[in-house]
Curated annotation (Swiss-Prot):
Protein name as annotated: Cytochrome c oxidase subunit 2
Lineage: Eukaryota, Metazoa, Chordata, Craniata, Vertebrata
Gene: mt-co2
Membrane topology recorded in Swiss-Prot or TrEMBL: Multi-pass membrane protein
Cofactor note: Binds a dinuclear copper A center per subunit.
EC number(s) on file: 7.1.1.9
InterPro entries assigned: Cyt_c_oxidase_su2_TM_dom (IPR011759), Cyt_c_oxidase_su2_TM_sf (IPR036257)
Main location as per UniProt: mitochondrion
Mitochondrial matrix side: 46-64
Role this protein plays: Component of the cytochrome c oxidase, the last enzyme in the mitochondrial electron transport chain which drives oxidative phosphorylation. The respiratory chain contains 3 multisubunit complexes succinate dehydrogenase (complex II, CII), ubiquinol-cytochrome c oxidoreductase (cytochrome b-c1 complex, complex III, CIII) and cytochrome c oxidase (complex IV, CIV), that cooperate to transfer electrons derived from NADH and succinate to molecular oxygen, creating an electrochemical gradient over the inner membrane that drives transmembrane transport and the ATP synthase.
Disulfide pattern: none
Residue ranges of the TM segments: 15-45
Residue intervals on the Mitochondrial intermembrane side: 1-14
Length: 64
């Protein structure tokens, strides 16, 4: 049941909707972990001082 001062959505009214909410939460967690990993790799590649002199035109960013 929705309340007047409620900030989020109301509770699921059916088991299918409840499972859909769990699926959504699980999917967002996976997307967040993948995005964090990619951002960490990009930051590590940009901030490292060990660069290959034969890599031209910022090809290291295309590896990611």
């Amino acid at each position: 049941m929705a309340h007047p001062s409620q900030l989020g959505f109301q509770d699921a009214a059916s088991p299918v909707m409840e499972e859909l909410x769990h699926f959504h939460d699980h999917t967002l967690m996976i997307v967040f972990l993948i995005s964090t990993l990619v951002x960490y790799i990009i930051v590590a590649m940009v901030s490292t001082k060990l660069t290959n002199k034969y890599v031209l035109d910022s090809q290291e960013i295309e590896i990611v």
